[in-house]
């Protein structure tokens, strides 16, 4: 299972409440929930939508996982393949890169104003059942077992913490740098194409973007 946790299952979209309930149960981000609602219900469409996953390689073999929500695989698959072929090293078989990712719950706690104490947040997160904790610029990232994310998020929310995001993610086991500007540009262009595609819900990759 990748991203929202709906891979391999069909979502029979009947009404707005059904869409929201299914998306929230899958920990889908709010912007993706809106996109899903707009796509599925904008024209009164009640077709079955299916969550499918594609795997492939960006420039220099960067590992990429794409999660899409589609009512027509024959439309979506060629488009995703085209993006991989145009700016990367092509789309691969199922499982070709997912082995190098771990499925985790990821909660990002806002600390833009730097008012939160790192030790306090870490202890609260671990007490709530978090598996790992990482301080970062402007935020703290809390990692959980996928099955524990709702419990941990609720405990932290009850303590007054505000989240930038809380969802299931595919976290790379290692990251890859792109040394050439051309490769970095092509990777950006490929990610932009995925972002602009209405069928695409999530994109995970192991590109180390810190230069």
Where are each of the predicted segments found?
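Helix N-cap / loop-to-helix initiation motif
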Residues: 27-32, 73-76, 117
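A general structural motif
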Residues: 46-47, 84-92, 113-123
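Translation machinery proteins
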Residues: 14-64
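RNA pseudouridine synthases
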Residues: 55-69, 76-103
